Amino acid sequence: LVSGEPHAGERVWRNLLKSDAAVDLVHFTILRPPEKQDGVPVDELSLIAFPTRELFVEKIKEFDLIIFDRYRMRGILPTSYIENVVNYVREGGTVLVAAGPEFGAVDSLYRSPLAEILPVAPTAQVIEEGFRPKITDLGRRHPVTEGLEKEAPEGGWGRWFRQIEVEQTAGQVLMSGAHG
């Protein structure tokens, strides 16, 4: 789990992943981007040096899933490490990009080698209106979302209030958003 910045949803990811004893979570949160100058010495920003080379070069094939959570390309991870993630996916690995408006920004992961394997391209439009996502016909049969409707609370799932507009470039649509 690579978190681009601290936020409340980060705790949800941690709790979800740590709730399964079979998951060995490695979590990296960027507390301060390199361009921010706040007077805190670099050696005081973490308890240990994060082993990025070890994780993104030597041990990348050992992961079942790599999650980028609100991650931006701000010089923290070298482009060569992102290229390693692309190769990891091409060789059968899995990546999940959980993003908000930053997905359409100039420092988006989409503007990196990762774009080669992403099924959507951001339009830079952010739709900010209430909507309820719906499972598509394909989504009702797909192993990722099959049975999800049965798990919905009485009255259905809550509304979502933001969607990043994208153009589908590959893959299959399992859920529809604000405008169908």
List where the protein language model places each region.
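A conserved amphipathic helix/loop scaffold
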Residues: 1-180
